[in-house]
Amino acid sequence: MLVSDFHFDLPDELIARYPTEERTASRLLHLNGETGHFEDKQFFDLLDQINEGDLLIFNNTRVIPARLYGRKASGGKLEILVERVLDEHRCLAHVRASKAPKEGAELVLGEDKLGEGNGFKAIMTARHDALFELHFNEEQPLFDLLQQAGHMPLPPYIDRPDEDADQERYQTVYSKVLGAVAAPTAGLHFDNPTLEKLKAKGVNIAFVTLHVGAGTFQPVRVDNILDHKMHAEYAEVSQAVVDQILATKATGKRVIAVGTTSVRSIESAAQAAEKEGKLITPFFSDTSIFLYPGKTFRIVDALVTNFHLPESTLIMLVSAFAGYRNTMKAYQHAVEAKYRFFSYGDAMFINKNPNALNDLP
């Protein structure tokens, strides 16, 4: 199975660089995975697709202002993107600079927001492949420093500086647990009134946590997808969520994941449970689960997701869920119908294809 099997041509003008004025004002492409039929709708029509007793699972991770600008104490500008906070004073980060800092190098960060001479210092203590371990020599916890001096880490394809409005719009309204460096974007379409309408309809709601890493934007750099090494992200699926999933399955209702990160969290927990002969168990660990055509989904029955990059692991996940041909036809239609793509773009609602295992490139 080749990466090129998941290519499609995307005009640059279809990349959404700003969100819609209202969260629910996006368009929605409904793809029935079983029949392959798709239909153009508006996002607020999603309410008609979700039934009483269904379980809607969201990812409640909260994006940290993870991008910092600064300089080496010895001179030379640099840009830092925090990938993972290790504790109150240490993190792993990507560093962009004309010359990579060496171990022991002192960095001065945040002066663009705090003023010249008011930045804070960090020491590069170790390198782990592409990531640098940084130690911040400040009394304040790292999360506080990022809130003061960090920028929202907009994805590279948005291709503009972050603005004040992104502080709100690049977060879901239910985000709670700090730790992501990218938003779980399917959730950006939901506002509080929509959540209240779902509850009033008798739809059950649950939250998992997966801290989305910058690896989600990394291109697949191999020809055969089986050679791809998936990045790891930390995920949590609590006992309470497991109980809700089991109760939903017992009544014959659907488990609906909001976003690929929710899918990966739930299916990671199911994969771990399989070794114990169970359907699903609580999960608190890193996951590098890679779902591509030929892989099975043990729990998730339907999916809300945005439109993803060509040749990305996310379009591979959608193809595994909806069927390869269904997915590529739906994407071709989305391009022709001028849907808006990627993080600030439009959404899909997909019913699982029970025959997806047989629909390979």
Swiss-Prot record:
<comment type="subunit">
    <text>Monomer.</text>
</comment>
<protein>
    <recommendedName>
        <fullName>S-adenosylmethionine:tRNA ribosyltransferase-isomerase</fullName>
        <ecNumber>2.4.99.17</ecNumber>
    </recommendedName>
</protein>
<comment type="function">
    <text>Transfers and isomerizes the ribose moiety from AdoMet to the 7-aminomethyl group of 7-deazaguanine (preQ1-tRNA) to give epoxyqueuosine (oQ-tRNA).</text>
</comment>
<dbReference type="InterPro" id="IPR036100">
    <property type="entry name" value="QueA_sf"/>
</dbReference>
<dbReference type="InterPro" id="IPR003699">
    <property type="entry name" value="QueA"/>
</dbReference>
<keyword id="KW-0949">S-adenosyl-L-methionine</keyword>
<dbReference type="GO" id="GO:0005737">
    <property type="term" value="C:cytoplasm"/>
</dbReference>
<dbReference type="GO" id="GO:0002099">
    <property type="term" value="P:tRNA wobble guanine modification"/>
</dbReference>
<dbReference type="InterPro" id="IPR042118">
    <property type="entry name" value="QueA_dom1"/>
</dbReference>
<keyword id="KW-0963">Cytoplasm</keyword>
<keyword id="KW-0671">Queuosine biosynthesis</keyword>
<keyword id="KW-0808">Transferase</keyword>
<dbReference type="Pfam" id="PF02547">
    <property type="entry name" value="Queuosine_synth"/>
</dbReference>
<dbReference type="InterPro" id="IPR042119">
    <property type="entry name" value="QueA_dom2"/>
</dbReference>
<dbReference type="GO" id="GO:0008616">
    <property type="term" value="P:queuosine biosynthetic process"/>
</dbReference>
<comment type="similarity">
    <text>Belongs to the QueA family.</text>
</comment>
<comment type="pathway">
    <text>tRNA modification; tRNA-queuosine biosynthesis.</text>
</comment>
<dbReference type="GO" id="GO:0051075">
    <property type="term" value="F:S-adenosylmethionine:tRNA ribosyltransferase-isomerase activity"/>
</dbReference>
